[in-house]
C-alpha cells in the first residue's frame, strides 16, 4: 500500500462534492491523504430551490437581492458553497472549471482540460461519476465520468517527442460513485448490471457529511434536510453494507490479489451492536 494517497475527485456540480463520496473524502483527508476536488460547473441551472422559494412569495414580500439576482451573482454564491464544503471535508485544493451547467457535452476541449489537471495533480486514485447513461440519468453526471475516463486514456498515451509532454501512468484505480436515484430504479436496488463492488463505511465521519450538505442553502439541502438526505441514502447503503452509513463504488477494472484478501477490518472483526459516535446526528448539533 502507498503510505499516503493522492486523490483526484471530479464532479459536475458543487452539490455532488457533498452528497456523493464526501464521507470517503473526509476519511482519506483525516488519514493525511492529499485531496484535489474538481467542480466542473457552478450548478446554476438545477436544484434552484432558493430562487424558486423567493419567486413563489407575493411581490411585496420578495427579497430584491435574491429575486433579482443575476446569473453571475448566483454562480458566485454557489462557488462559495463549494468552498465551504471543501473546507468541511478537508480538501487540499479546489479547482473550478467554469463550464456551463446543463451543457456538459463530451468534446476534446473538455477532455484536454481534465487531462491537464491530471498531469498537474498526478493522482494515484480518481473518483468520479459512473459514466453510464440510462433513460433516467441527468446527463451532466455520466458525461463528466466519460470525459474523465477519456482524459485518463489521453494522459497515458502521450509521447514527448510528438506531444511535448510525458505520459502519465500513475493512476492505480478509478472509483465510480453513484448519483442519487439515477442508477437506482423503483423496482430493484440498482439498475440491472450496475452493482457496487466496494463499500466504504463512513459512520465515523457522518457528521462531516451532514455538515457538508448543510452548506447547500441554494438547493434547500440545509438544516434538517441535510440529515434526511444522509439517512435516506447513506443509511440505506449502510443497511446493504452491514454498517450504519456507507458509500458505494464501482471499479472499471478488477484488482488482482496474490492471495484471498483479508483486510484487518475483517480479520479483527468481533460482533458488536452498531453504535453511532455522536448519538442522533442532525445538522443542528454539528459544529
Residues of each region from the PLM?
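Active-site rim/loop-helix segments in enzyme catalytic domains that contact anionic ligands
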Residues: 1-121, 154, 233, 262, ...
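Metal-dependent de-N-acetylase/amidase catalytic core
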Residues: 1-10, 100, 104-287
Amino acid at each position: 500500500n502507498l503510505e499516503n494517497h493522492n486523490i483526484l475527485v471530479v464532479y459536475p456540480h458543487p452539490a455532488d462534492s457533498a452528497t456523493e463520496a464526501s464521507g470517503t473524502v473526509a476519511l482519506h483527508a483525516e488519514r493525511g491523504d492529499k485531496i484535489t476536488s474538481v467542480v466542473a460547473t457552478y450548478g446554476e441551472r438545477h436544484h434552484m430551490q432558493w430562487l424558486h422559494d423567493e419567486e413563489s412569495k407575493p411581490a411585496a414580500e420578495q427579497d430584491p437581492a435574491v429575486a433579482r439576482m443575476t446569473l453571475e451573482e448566483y454562480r458566485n454564491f454557489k462557488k462559495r458553497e463549494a468552498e465551504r464544503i471543501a473546507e468541511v471535508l478537508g480538501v487540499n485544493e479546489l479547482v473550478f472549471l467554469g463550464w456551463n451547467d446543463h451543457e456538459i457535452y463530451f468534446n476534446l476541449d473538455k477532455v484536454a482540460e481534465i487531462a491537464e489537471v491530471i498531469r498537474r495533480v498526478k493522482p494515484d486514485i480518481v473518483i468520479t461519476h459512473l459514466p453510464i447513461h440510462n433513460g433516467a440519468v441527468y446527463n451532466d453526471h455520466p458525461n463528466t465520468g466519460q470525459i474523465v475516463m477519456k482524459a485518463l486514456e489521453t494522459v497515458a498515451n502521450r509521447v514527448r517527442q510528438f506531444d511535448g509532454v510525458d505520459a502519465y501512468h500513475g493512476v492505480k484505480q478509478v472509483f465510480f460513485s453513484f448519483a442519487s436515484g439515477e442508477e437506482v430504479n423503483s423496482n430493484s436496488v440498482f439498475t440491472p448490471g450496475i452493482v457496487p463492488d466496494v463499500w466504504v463505511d463512513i459512520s465515523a465521519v457522518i457528521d462531516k457529511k451532514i455538515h457538508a450538505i448543510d452548506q447547500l442553502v441554494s438547493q434547500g439541502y440545509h438544516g434538517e434536510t441535510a440529515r434526511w438526505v444522509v439517512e435516506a441514502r447513506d443509511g440505506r447503503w449502510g443497511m446493504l453494507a452491514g454498517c450504519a452509513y456507507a458509500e458505494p463504488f464501482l471499479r472499471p477494472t478488477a484488482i488482482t490479489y496474490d492471495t484471498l484478501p483479508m483486510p484487518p477490518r475483517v480479520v479483527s472483526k468481533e460482533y458488536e451492536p452498531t453504535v453511532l459516535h455522536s448519538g442522533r446526528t442532525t445538522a443542528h448539533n454539528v459544529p
